[in-house]
Amino acid sequence: MATKRTYQPSNLKRKRDHGFRARMKTADGRKILSRRRAKGRKVLSA
């Protein structure tokens, strides 16, 4: 029996886990966003 690939893409899970609203929910998530803003990232989150 072959092992399943670990990456099974789903846009819903992508947004829920890494989206902007998900980042804003936690203090650490907001830290991530502020770091990415400071770095000058064009895209802040998924």
UniProtKB/Swiss-Prot annotation:
GO terms for cellular component: ribonucleoprotein complex; ribosome. Residues 1-46 are annotated as: Disordered. One of its GO terms (molecular function) is structural constituent of ribosome. InterPro entries: Ribosomal_bL34 (IPR000271), Ribosomal_bL34_CS (IPR020939). It holds the Pfam family Ribosomal_L34. Residues 12-24, 32-46 have a biased composition (Basic residues). Coiled coil: none annotated. Keywords: Ribonucleoprotein, Ribosomal protein. PANTHER family: LARGE RIBOSOMAL SUBUNIT PROTEIN BL34M, MITOCHONDRIAL RIBOSOMAL PROTEIN 34 FAMILY MEMBER. Belongs to the bacterial ribosomal protein bL34 family. This is Large ribosomal subunit protein bL34. It comes from Stenotrophomonas maltophilia (strain K279a). The gene is rpmH.
